[in-house]
Amino acid sequence: MLFIRSLAFNIALYVNTIVQMIIWAPLYFLLPRKNAWFVPKFWAASCLWLHKILAGARAEISGVEHLPSGPCIIAPKHQSFWDTIAFLPSIPDALYILKRELMWIPLFGWYVAKMRMIPIDRGSRSKALRQAVKIGRERMRENRQLIIYPEGTRRPPGAEPAYKYGIVELYAQLQVPVVPVAHVAGLYWPRRKFMRYPGVIRARFLPPIEPGLSREDFLQRLIRETEAACDELLLEAARSPNHPPLPPTAIARIEELKKDRS
């Protein structure tokens, strides 16, 4: 049954994406950029609904009140495709940093281009970071919310923190609050895996880190607060009845936490 539900959801996800891009295209490209935001937000919400109905995984997102009313940086953990869509309905005017190659995909790339995201060449990290800072500063004047994954790539729940320098430089240069986001969605929607596991996927927007800290103080605070919240969510998920399979990184981290608290 789990395989069938996973298969049904994976097929529905792609079909839903393609169909919505085609159906909404005439209206989406005619509307002004901000007015057109309801289309990707509706798509993201519909994907979460399909995930709930077909795979049995319900999203429960808290702490949205911590989002500043003006420009900010949102820094979620990156474990799954789930965290690229789940927060979109909650963010007023999201701004993503993405690989420039995604802009070359027919139709999808046009959708992204309309929202004026930040495409970068990941082959040159220093150049990509300078470009992200330059364009990010321009977009901040439009009261947008920049989403960046501090660890860069997807990592399994419980893995050792591996935060990159990019988030630090953006914090220092853009001088806006940073809102960490904790979750363990990788338990339910694992990276590079076919199976989708049922349960409640809890995510939490944490209180913002205001600008003004030194680079090192900011990084240590970001890691400390994000990882502490992720640890709590991991323990909560592991204690839940019929919890999803725990990857080795999650098992090892839970054992560490138990020792520390004993």
What is the predicted function of each stretch?
Residues F3, R130-S262:
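Non-catalytic C-terminal accessory region of glycerolipid acyltransferases
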Residues I4-F29:
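A hydrophobic membrane-anchoring feature enriched in long, contiguous, low-charge segments
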Residues G63-L67:
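Glycine-rich helix-loop-beta junction characteristic of Rossmann-like nucleotide cofactor-binding loops
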Residues M21-K41, A45, K52-L54, S69-R125:
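Catalytic core of membrane glycerolipid acyltransferases/transacylases, capturing the structured
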Residues A55-I61:
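Membrane-helix interfacial anchor on the cytosolic side
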Residues I61, I118-D121, P211:
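Short acidic-hydrophobic, aromatic-tinged amphipathic segments that line or gate anion-handling sites
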Residues I61, I74, Y96-I97, A203-F205:
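Generic preference for hydrophobic
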